[in-house]
């Protein structure tokens, strides 16, 4: 199947925007994210045409589909929240395939400002990170790695060693050992469907501790 905006959809949006004041913020909910499937480097069909119709407004796309969690900033006033799934990996696991716990996102607008947080099922709203010790992460075995699933470019991820500030952690690509364990247990040695295989994600942050760190 193809993902994008059909010509008749663009015509509808163009007509609709004639009635929307320029001061209005826009929230566009759709199933597929603007970037399409995981790993895509180009936008879905006619995405740039849609952008041209809504440009000038503050625009937030809210999407799903991929069972991963990402925040994208396409332009100064055009961003997207691609939200992980409440069902994890189609009810087989407690985590989505990028390592995000199954859950949902809560949006609040107050005094003209939009805020949000990811609510992991079974946890309170402050549960926003999982930490992995050296030896646990497949692509960074010598590092402490933080999975900060709702990270966006406005966030800073920093670390301390034995109470001493060490600076910013390095943003890295990795896969979740928790999801890998869960999906392997669910399939019990059978071939895992391709769309459920562990996905590399860019919301991991790594730091290498010193030899004698406590």
Where are these regions (language model features)?
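His/acidic metal-ligating clusters that form di-metal
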Residues: 1-82, 142
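A short, hydrophobic/aromatic-rich structural module that often spans a beta strand
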Residues: 36, 40-43, 128-136, 171
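Extended low-complexity, serine/threonine- and proline-enriched intrinsically disordered segments
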Residues: 155-182
């Amino acid at each position: 199947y193809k993902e994008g905006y059909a010509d008749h959809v663009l015509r509808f949006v163009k007509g609709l925007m004639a009635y929307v004041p320029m001061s209005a913020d826009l929230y566009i909910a759709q199933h597929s994210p603007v970037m399409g499937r995981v790993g895509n480097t180009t936008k879905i069909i006619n995405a740039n045409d849609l952008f041209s119709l809504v440009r000038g407004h503050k625009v937030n796309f809210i999407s799903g589909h991929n069972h991963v969690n990402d925040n994208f900033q396409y332009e100064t006033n055009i961003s997207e929240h691609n939200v992980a799934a409440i069902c994890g990996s189609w009810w087989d696991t407690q985590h989505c395939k990028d390592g995000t716990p199954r859950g949902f996102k809560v949006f609040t607008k107050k005094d003209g400002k939009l805020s949000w947080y990811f609510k992991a099922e079974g946890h309170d709203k402050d549960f926003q990170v999982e930490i992995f010790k050296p030896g646990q992460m497949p692509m960074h075995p010598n590092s402490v790695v933080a999975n900060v699933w709702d990270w966006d470019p406005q966030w800073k991820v920093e670390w301390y060693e034995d109470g001493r500030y060490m600076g910013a952690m390095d943003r890295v690509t990795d896969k979740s050992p928790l999801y890998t364990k869960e999906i392997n247990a669910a399939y019990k040695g059978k071939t895992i469907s391709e769309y459920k295989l562990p996905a590399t994600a860019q919301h991991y942050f790594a730091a290498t501790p010193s030899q004698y760190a406590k």
